Amino acid sequence: MTTLLSISALLITVMLMQMGTGALGPLDTLSAIELGFSNIQIGVIGAAHFTGFIIGCFGAPALVRRVGHARAYIVTVALSITAVLLHPIFPTFWAWCLFRVFTGLAIATSFTAVESWLNAKLTRQNRGRFFSIYRLMDMMGALIAQSLIVILIPIENLSYMILAIILC
């Protein structure tokens, strides 16, 4: 029980991170449609996120080793929040591609920092149990993110601000 309490903030953080980034993709798609982006442009914007995610997967371990779990997480969350907040300020195709690369990179690095921290904190006896709780929180965040789309208004600054607040 004490282990669960010690990692509960981390588990809630994972859920919120997944909520914020999970809602960004659909919000970007709906906003891009309203802005008149072509279907190909919308697809490229979506792919840009995963391009950044792949880059983050390769670069994250070195960053975590170099600066530590907490600093790596904080820097990448700040990058993600900045990229989210820039969407309504620069509503252009190339800017959104760049922002989505940044969010993908940031999320991959954030997940790497969290998961490696958990691996370091947990023991062989409780790792499976706590990683199942971790995945449950992760998936709950993704599920809630899809429900957020109902209240988020495409292109509105407020919608992107809400996602940035959730990511904080």
Give short role names for the model-derived ranges.
Residues 160-168:
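Symmetry-related core transmembrane helices of the 12-TM Major Facilitator Superfamily/SLC fold
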Residues 3-50:
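Helix-loop boundary and gating motifs at the non-cytosolic
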Residues 94-102:
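Paired small-residue
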Residues 68, 89-94:
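Helix-breaking motifs and short loop linkers at transmembrane-helix boundaries and internal kinks
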Residues 56-68, 153:
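Helix-to-loop junctions at the C-terminal end of transmembrane segments
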Residues 78-91:
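C-terminal ends and interior cores of transmembrane alpha-helices
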Residues 109-122:
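Intracellular juxtamembrane helix-capping segments at the cytosolic ends
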